[in-house]
Amino acid sequence: MFSTTTNNIEGHPVREYLGIVTGEVIVGANLFRDLFASITDIVGGRSGKYEDVLARARKEALGEMEAEAAKLGGNAVIGVDIDYEVLGQNGSMLMVSASGTAVVI
């Protein structure tokens, strides 16, 4: 499965547009609280633990989006956009969402 932020894949013309596909992942409060308590690896203002959690959430959201594209018969997703949104009363949750257009190339 190809996924790209661009609207085309050079050398692979789009044969069919199948529609918008999405994937969402929500990281809950307990995870962030646990990470806050154990931030001992901050180097230069960065936390490896937070970055790992965000990377996993992003990968899962992209995976869900690609799985939805495959269910529609697509073999690529173009125009991919990844968004992050804080949710909950105290900003206790983070949603990572990926969206794009499923296509056949």
Swiss-Prot record:
Coiled coil: none annotated. It comes from the Bacteria. InterPro entries: UPF0145_dom_sf (IPR035439), UPF0145_YbjQ-like (IPR002765). Belongs to the UPF0145 family. This is UPF0145 protein Sala_0338. It comes from Sphingopyxis alaskensis (strain DSM 13593 / LMG 18877 / RB2256) (Sphingomonas alaskensis). The lineage of its organism: Bacteria, Pseudomonadati, Pseudomonadota, Alphaproteobacteria, Sphingomonadales.
